[in-house]
UniProtKB/Swiss-Prot annotation:
Residues that, per the record, bind beta-D-fructose 1,6-bisphosphate: K156, H171
InterPro entries: L-lactate/malate_DH (IPR001557), L-lactate_DH (IPR011304), L-lactate_DH_AS (IPR018177), Lactate/malate_DH_C (IPR022383), Lactate/malate_DH_N (IPR001236), Lactate_DH/Glyco_Ohase_4_C (IPR015955), NAD(P)-bd_dom_sf (IPR036291)
Keyword vocabulary terms for this entry: Allosteric enzyme, Cytoplasm, NAD, Oxidoreductase, Phosphoprotein
Biochemical pathway: Fermentation; pyruvate fermentation to lactate; (S)-lactate from pyruvate: step 1/1
Species, as recorded: Clostridium perfringens (strain 13 / Type A)
Name of the protein in its database record: L-lactate dehydrogenase
E.C. number: 1.1.1.27
Keyword Cytoplasm: yes
Gene: ldh
Length: 317
């Protein structure tokens, strides 16, 4: 009998994002084995039990909690553990708190799954992905951040609402930091093959272009608005993570705005930022050096410098 290749995914962190990601992965049937690890072992056990009891409704999957030894030989390790921003805090305010957590997590993950792909979701994601890259010693392709995959989805949704079209027919990217210095790449935004400005003029009556100022701010503030109301975000980010995992496991060569290591692109070096990137079974295969406007390039460089400054001021050795 020919056995289908199995995929093992471990999730470090059984909080709102980690547990919801496990649920999304389970529903999509992307893994044959899912292991949930958390410092709170009772919480991890309860989440795994709750998910496992729905096994009759999904494709065959073994879901369990455990410790790092149970993550051995994972194909992908998703890191969601860490301290999230409280109301009034930004993602960058929590760097050193999460640095200490990652210094305890990453060596254990590397020990048991030296050939895995590491997918960082915890915030500030670009900085923590860089930290994971340094701590792991892995090739850059195998250390990926969730980047602005979620931000890009948020913008697609908002543009779809603005123009009253399906979000899947909106093509756009948020680039740079997953955070306050992120950039909306209007030069890469199109609907039905037309640049968004031309589409606006052609299709919409009284189009004044004000959405180009309003929507980027709404995207930036979306997470803070949700956190202020319910204390955390979990659903959309879990779907974003699941999309990245799907692209990896299915070797899709998909173009996603994951956080990848820059090595000279746009004059930027030695920092993780989000940019349209080819994602396949090897991980983040290639950052696409796509043409963007001069203003977008300048803002991308500024975003990189902000992140580099925070890394330099962190407690990373």
């Amino acid at each position: 009998m020919i056995r289908e290749k199995t995929n093992k995914i471990s999730i470090i962190g059984a909080g709102f994002v980690g547990s919801t990601t496990a649920f999304a992965l389970m529903q999509d049937g992307l893994a044959s084995e899912i292991v949930i690890v958390d410092i709170n072992k009772d919480k991890a056990h309860a989440e795994a039990m709750d998910l496992a009891q729905g096994a009759a409704f999904v494709k065959s999957v073994d879901i369990k909690s455990g410790d790092y030894a149970d993550t051995k030989d994972s194909d992908i390790v998703i890191i969601t553990a860490g301290v999230g921003p409280k109301p009034g805090e930004t993602r960058l305010d929590i760097i050193n708190k999460n640095l200490k957590i990652f210094q305890s997590i990453v060596p254990e993950v590397v020990k048991y799954s030296p050939n895995s792909i590491l997918l960082v979701v915890s915030n500030p994601v670009d900085i923590l992905t860089y930290i994971t890259y340094k701590l792991s010693g892995f090739p850059k392709e195998r250390v990926i951040g969730s980047g602005t995959v979620l931000d890009t989805s948020r913008l697609k949704y908002m543009l779809s609402e603005h123009f009253d079209i399906d979000a899947r027919n909106v093509h756009t990217y948020i680039i740079g930091e997953h955070g306050d210095s992120e950039i909306t790449a209007w030069s890469l935004t199109n609907i039905a093959g037309a640049n968004v400005e031309e589409y606006c003029k052609t299709v919409c009556a009284n189009c004044d272009g004000s959405f180009k100022k309003e929507l980027p701010e709404k995207v930036k503030n979306a997470a803070y608005e949700i956190i202020n109301s319910k204390g955390y975000t979990n659903y959309a980010v879990a779907l974003a993570v699941t999309r990245i995992v799907e692209a990896i496991l299915r070797d899709e060569n998909a173009i996603l705005t994951v956080s990848s290591l820059f090595e000279g692109q746009y004059g930027i070096d030695n920092v993780y930022l989000a940019m349209p990137t080819i994602v396949d079974r090897s991980g983040a295969r290639q950052i696409l050096d796509v043409p963007i406007s001069n203003e977008e390039k300048e803002n991308l460089i500024k975003s990189a410098e902000i992140l580099k400054g925070h890394i330099a001021n962190s407690e990373l050795d």
